[in-house]
């Protein structure tokens, strides 16, 4: 796998840089050049060649063996989020898949990074779905199991109205589906309409998508 410091990663990012520009909207804002998961170079049509967002993700993702426990290969997206062009491409692509939501739910902790960026792009609010014990009470709690142990997620039971709102769950990685499944149950207990989930990376071999069916799931890269 190529990383940000390699020539391949630099090539991908240099092409992406030509595909992001600014246009007037009162104050200047980013012009959108992401179409159906492809990053278009400036001036190119939708029919011309483009760099896949999946290639961007792959070029800036680091594999870490035996983390956080032995036997687990961790997908570290920190280099992707730290790169302004990589983050911009991922934000645009996820925002496209979350279109129509009036609230975005970001999952603790790396999901916060992309969820906040997507919410800003869509001009909607972001709800922090926290790990157990991180929020002041009263809270709604949901226990679940993931590939390396049990965990708890929580949202505020007061102060934020989620009932009747169309929510899309945003996270960095989809593995077994345990985290997103628990988030969905938590939101639905609060009365939300969970429209789908969007993630940066899907670990296809762990069958998380099947575990979440029939919830619509969108991923930018399947590894």
Swiss-Prot record:
Keywords: Cytoplasm, Glycosyltransferase, Purine salvage, Transferase. It catalyses: AMP + diphosphate = 5-phospho-alpha-D-ribose 1-diphosphate + adenine. Its EC number is 2.4.2.7. It is found in: Cytoplasm. One of its GO terms (biological process) is AMP salvage. One of its GO terms (cellular component) is cytoplasm. Gene3D superfamilies: 3.40.50.2020. It is an enzyme of class 2 (transferase). GO terms for molecular function: adenine binding; adenine phosphoribosyltransferase activity; AMP binding. SUPFAM superfamilies: PRTase-like (SSF53271). Disulfide bonds: none annotated. Pathway: Purine metabolism; AMP biosynthesis via salvage pathway; AMP from adenine: step 1/1. Homodimer. Belongs to the purine/pyrimidine phosphoribosyltransferase family. Catalyzes a salvage reaction resulting in the formation of AMP, that is energically less costly than de novo synthesis. This is Adenine phosphoribosyltransferase. The gene is apt.
């Amino acid at each position: 796998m190529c990383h940000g410091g390699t020539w391949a990663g630099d090539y991908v990012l240099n092409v992406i840089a030509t595909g992001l520009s600014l246009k007037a909207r009162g104050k200047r804002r980013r012009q959108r050049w992401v179409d159906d998961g492809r990053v278009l170079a400036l001036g190119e049509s939708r029919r011309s060649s483009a760099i896949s967002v999946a290639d961007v993700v792959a070029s800036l993702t680091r594999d870490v063996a035996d983390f956080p426990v032995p036997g687990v290969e961790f997908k570290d997206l920190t280099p992707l989020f730290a790169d302004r062009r990589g983050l911009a491409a991922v934000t645009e692509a996820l925002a496209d898949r979350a279109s129509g939501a009036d609230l975005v739910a970001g999952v603790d902790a790396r999901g916060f990074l992309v969820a906040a960026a997507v919410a800003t792009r869509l001009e909607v609010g972001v709800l922090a779905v926290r790990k157990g014990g991180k929020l002041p009470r009263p809270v709604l709690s949901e226990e679940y199991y993931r590939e390396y142990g049990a965990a708890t997620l929580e949202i505020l039971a007061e102060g934020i109205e989620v009932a009747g709102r169309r929510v899309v769950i945003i996270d960095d990685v989809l593995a077994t589906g345990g985290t997103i499944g628990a988030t969905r149950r938590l939101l639905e207990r609060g009365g939300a309409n969970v429209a789908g989930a969007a993630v940066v990376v899907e670990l296809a071999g762990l069958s998380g998508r099947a575990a979440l069916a029939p919830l619509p799931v969108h991923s930018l890269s399947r590894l």
